[in-house]
Amino acid sequence: MAELVIALDYPTMDAALATARALRGATDTAGDAGGRLWMKVGLELFTASGPEVVARLKDMGFPVFLDLKFHDIPNTVRGAVRSAVATGADMCNIHLPGGERMCRAAVEGLAEGAAARGHGAAPILLGVTVLTSVAPGELPGGADPSAEAARLAVCGREWGLGGVVCSGYEAAGIKQRCGRDFICLTPGIRPAAPQRSGSGDDDQRRVMTPAEAVRAGSDYLVVGRPVTGAAGPDGPAEAARRILAEMRGA
């Protein structure tokens, strides 16, 4: 069963934790669906709050995806991934275009961090293929986003990563080429029209509904504004429940 990841894209830790507390009411539903409700900490929130926000979310019982998309020289990325694991994060990511040496160094950093942590399940390391904000025709040289994502995913598999970040449009092809156990985490998830909130599809371009992404083979679905922007104190939990129900019905 695919699992739901809530993107806590906030400028402050207080705002992120308030939403996380509001989402506690959806965790029973997630458990009934056979999965867990994850929290995603991205660049804005982590830069503002540091490792404390990961620790606070873990204390609330949520698994955490630390979405920092490392892309630097191999030794720097190795240390960054090792430090990401030390925060207690259950999943982190790097940019696959950083190349083979960088990606293999990241895998080494993951193993070192897991050994130092010494408890719990080994964290998941994902490679970012093509951002879901990229539309066809926007890549250099006119490269096709889906073809480029598939090419990078095959490289990531060879270099030792556990999966990739990709749009739902690429998930089925990546599973065929890399195996069913190769994880596909999919951002750009937007609920069916009656549940949408905010202005259109915002900055996302290659979007799918939760049911479409599950049917395509995505293992983790990332949803932000349709949940975090839901009105009322019970709005985020209700929005998450509806998305989980759509995922179960796929």
Curated annotation (Swiss-Prot):
Coiled coil: none
Class of enzymatic activity (EC top level): lyase
Cellular component aspect of the GO annotation: cytosol
Catalytic reactions of this protein: orotidine 5'-phosphate + H(+) = UMP + CO2
Keywords for this protein: Decarboxylase, Lyase, Pyrimidine biosynthesis
Active site (record annotation): 69 (proton donor)
Binding-site positions, substrate: 9, 40, 67-76, 132, 190, 204, 224-225
BP GO annotations: 'de novo' pyrimidine nucleobase biosynthetic process; 'de novo' UMP biosynthetic process
Any matching Pfam family: OMPdecase
PROSITE patterns: OMPDECASE
Record function comment: Catalyzes the decarboxylation of orotidine 5'-monophosphate (OMP) to uridine 5'-monophosphate (UMP).
The protein's assembly and partners: Homodimer.
PANTHER family in the cross-refs: OROTIDINE 5'-PHOSPHATE DECARBOXYLASE
Official protein name in the record: Orotidine 5'-phosphate decarboxylase
Gene: pyrF
